[in-house]
């Protein structure tokens, strides 16, 4: 088979161009540190690297999300702790105020501190995260959730809670809505609430309420109605008499499965109500306690009314403290989930980075050796081309 001079030139040129392309690719790998400079070099590897890039970008977003929600949850945990301390102080003041020997001046000082505690609680409920977002506004940004007007606290947030993605298929709840934290708080014991009729004219004070038989009570609304200083009737929700009994100061009275302990002498017609514990805002609890202590107490009936509200408030405050402790424990559980997700993300990131490195990163020693090989091959091809160019039949005939 004869090979023409033109073919020899074409083959030689193609060989040199191929070597030059290999040299260029190898030099680019050494400069960039990336051996997947073109997808055509390794289509499967390039596709895998692209998937890992996307996964790593998602992990970075999850990390940013975790940082934000973790910061907000830590602030919520601190706010709940401060709110609990505020209620603890209010309870101490209530116990001090539940003292018949207290002077009017001392009681006035207690009332002033209770008012300050209410303002303090409002400030806690309106805290933000330092980035312009309220902690307790639910999903509503840009609003101050709580406002005090004419002695009443209103809520401008909503009941929602944002769910924040912190890992693949894993989301955690953001801070709780203020309505859940500060408004929907069970009064009384959390299960049942006993309260004195504000129209009572006797001196009886309800000291404690507790559920003795939950099956018997079953959440029923009942009323203890005194027919005299030492006799009473139990009425159901329809006003029907279901039982009667006699009373001595300090007695515990069973009211349909709920035990009421009273002291003092009631008047005929005085009543005490038993009901399933309703929700009561912590602001209302503080306001009610302060108002009761500030109210005139010149008569036995007025003093009994004040003491009944203080007694009820002590139960309400204890229930509110338990509520905040539960909220704080739930917040801690979410923070633990954020921390656990961070550990999982870190492990995943290390694994994916190692895989990506094996797919993409250049082995510099191997690439340098390969470059030397390609350069040597190019020099040999160039030398061969030069020799071929010098060959011709006329040279042989000289």
Summary of predicted features, one role per range:
Residues 1-150, 172, 277, 284-398:
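Amphipathic alpha-helical polymerization modules
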């Amino acid at each position: 088979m004869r090979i023409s001079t033109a073919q020899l030139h074409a083959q030689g040129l193609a060989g040199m161009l191929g070597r030059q392309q290999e040299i260029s690719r190898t030099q680019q790998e050494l400069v960039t540190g990336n051996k997947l400079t073109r997808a055509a070099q390794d289509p499967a590897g390039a596709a895998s690297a692209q998937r890992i890039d996307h996964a790593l970008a998602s992990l970075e977003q999850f990390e940013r999300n975790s940082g934000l929600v973790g910061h907000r949850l830590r602030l919520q945990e601190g706010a709940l702790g401060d709110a609990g301390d505020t209620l603890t102080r209010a309870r101490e003041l209530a116990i001090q105020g539940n003292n018949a020997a207290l002077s009017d001046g001392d009681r006035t000082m207690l009332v002033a501190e209770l008012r300050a505690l209410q303002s303090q609680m409002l400030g806690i409920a309106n805290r933000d995260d330092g980035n312009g977002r309220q902690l307790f506004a639910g999903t509503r940004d840009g609003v101050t959730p709580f406002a005090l007007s004419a002695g009443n606290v209103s809520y401008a947030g909503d009941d929602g809670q944002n769910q924040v993605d912190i890992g693949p298929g894993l989301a955690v709840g953001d801070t709780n809505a203020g309505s859940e934290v500060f408004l929907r708080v069970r009064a009384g014991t959390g299960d049942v609430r006993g309260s004195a009729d504000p129209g009572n004219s006797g001196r009886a004070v309800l000291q404690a309420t507790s559920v003795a038989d939950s099956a018997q009570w079953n959440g029923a609304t009942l009323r203890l109605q005194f027919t005299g200083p030492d006799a009473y009737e139990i009425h159901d929700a329809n006003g029907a008499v279901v039982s009667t009994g006699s009373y001595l100061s300090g007695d515990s009275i069973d009211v349909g499965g709920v035990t009421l302990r009273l002291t003092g002498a009631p008047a005929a017609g005085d009543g005490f109500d038993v009901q399933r514990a309703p929700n009561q805002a912590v602001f209302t609890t503080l306001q009610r306690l302060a108002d009761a202590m500030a109210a005139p107490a010149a008569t036995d009936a007025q003093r009994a009314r004040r003491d009944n509200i203080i007694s009820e408030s002590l139960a309400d405050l204890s229930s509110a403290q338990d509520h905040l402790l539960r909220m704080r424990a739930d917040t801690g559980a979410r923070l633990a989930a954020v921390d656990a997700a961070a550990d999982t993300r870190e492990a995943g990131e290390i694994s994916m980075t190692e895989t990506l490195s094996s797919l993409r990163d250049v082995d510099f020693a191997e690439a340098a050796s390969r470059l030397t090989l390609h350069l040597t091959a190019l020099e040999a091809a160039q030398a061969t081309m030069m020799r071929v160019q010098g060959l011709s039949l006329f040279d042989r005939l000289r």
